[in-house]
A protein has these predicted regions:
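Generic N-terminal amphipathic, Lys/Arg-enriched alpha-helix
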Residues: 1-13
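Residue-level detector of functional hotspots within protein domains
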Residues: 3-4, 22, 64
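Structured catalytic/translocation cores of nucleotide/phosphate-coupled proteins
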Residues: 9, 26-29, 55-56
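Broad hydrophobic/π-residue packing in well-ordered secondary structure
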Residues: 10-13, 28, 36-38
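A short, N-terminal amphipathic alpha-helix
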Residues: 21-31, 69
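Active-site-proximal beta-alpha core segment in soluble small-molecule metabolic enzymes
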Residues: 34-102
């Protein structure tokens, strides 16, 4: 499909450029020993999570629904932070992933 034929509004992601950027981040991880996580608030295009998961260590989430999305679509480390949690949310976060950092 030609870009001129796209119906707008829409998001167009250049996967070649995305892979280039992810490769840079992966090199930073390797060179420094740090972990780089995808901030889902900044980029929540979950269609690309399997690709991103090939390069990064996981996701950050600000609550239960983002944590679930990160687990289901990327399946890697999941860092969750919110100023407060409901008891039911804590229970479900534990069920989503035992490795979640809350």
């Amino acid at each position: 499909m030609r870009i001129e034929e796209l119906k707008t509004p829409c998001y167009v992601i250049d996967e070649k450029q995305l892979k280039k950027n992810l490769s840079i981040l992966q090199k930073v991880e390797k060179d420094t020993g740090c972990k780089i996580l995808l901030a889902q608030k900044a980029f929540s295009c979950f269609y690309e999570y399997p690709l991103i998961g090939q390069y990064l260590d996981g996701t950050t989430a600000s609550g239960l629904y983002e944590a679930r999305l990160g687990k289901e679509e990327m399946g890697k480390e999941n860092h969750v932070f919110a100023p407060a949690y409901k008891d039911a949310d804590i229970k479900e976060l534990g069920e989503i992933d035992r490795k979640s950092v809350v």
